[in-house]
Every structure is written in structure tokens, then in C-alpha cells.
Amino acid sequence: MHGKRAGLALLAAALTLLLSGCFVKTVDELYTLPRHSDEYDRLELAIDAVLSGQSAVYSAPVSGPNQQSVQLADLDGDGQEEAIAFLKAAGDRPLRACIFSRVDGDYHLTDVIEGDGTSFASVEYVQLTGQPGIELVIGRQLSTDVLQSLSAYSYSDGHVAELMNANYSEYRVVDLDGDGRKDIFLLRFEAEQPQGIAELYRWQAGQMER
């Protein structure tokens, strides 16, 4: 127990350094819409159909390295990028990340990640599992409170699977043990916990474990 607490204390100190600006994370790739072309127009038509069908509007992430309303990433590792549109609709679970795959030159909606909240706080594309492709880490602002919601997802065969979900005040995605897979380290401050809570999530035995 003491060893675990000491480990979390060291991680908390590392996160403090990251938040203070001592380490600057570079962006390896910018996820943006393709240039105007037939492909661009087809993607736009596919997204417009979802916008009108769900009475939704664009809802770009408000912070982090990826703040475009529509982003491109090869989520499943097949060599072809998926398009992810970040939208907000009415009703329950209004925040929606819509994933479009390209088939024979056309884009088709393959899955939707729905979540609660008022806005997308951040979006990152990282290698969590060591499997082909990259995972999607989404932060959501729940309300005007400090706490936010963080979820990680994998995408394979046209379907999304949630890997973890937790509330957080601050988080970082870093490879702490040098195995080539990123770990998720988060801090959570609550009124009843004046010292805060530190949690580490890493891929072990086929799942994200805390």
C-alpha cells in the first residue's frame, strides 16, 4: 500500500512538472479536413446528412492539440484514414463523435460515440493497446464545475469499444514504462477530498486497468 502511494506521489509530481510547462509535447500530425476535392465534397455531404438528420451542429474541442470540428486519423490501422466529426445535438448524451469510413470513394457513417456534457474539452489520438491503429481519447466538459469526463476508445471492423471512463480535473497521456504504449495519468480534485486523487490507467491483460 505504501509503495503504491509513493508511486502515485511520484506520478503526481511528474504531472505537476508537465502542467507547469517544463515539458512541451510536440504534435506529430495535424488532423484536418482534406483539401477541396471530390473526396472533400463527398465527406461534406455525408456529414451534412448527419447534421440534418440529428438536428446537430459542429462542436469542436475547446482545448488541446486537435481543435478541428472534423479530423482525420487511421483509427483501425488499415492504412486508410477515418474522418471523425465532433457534433452536438439536443436531448440526452448530446455530444457525439461521428466516425466516417471511406468505401469506394464515398464516406459512410460507421459508428457514433455518444456522451454527456456541454462541450468536447479535448481530443487525442494515441497508442494505448499496442494493436494496429490508434486509440481515441476524449475529454468532455460536464458542466461549469471543474470536473470533466475522460474516455478512451478503440475502433475496429467499423465498431467502437470503450476502454475506460473516469472523471478528472487534469490528465496526461505518457509512456511511463517505455513499452511503446501510452498510459493515462489523471488527477481529480473533489470537495470532500482536499488532497485530490491520482489514478493511473494502463493496458494490461487485454484491458485498461487502474
Where in the sequence are the language-model features?
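Beta-propeller-forming repeat regions
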Residues: G21-R210
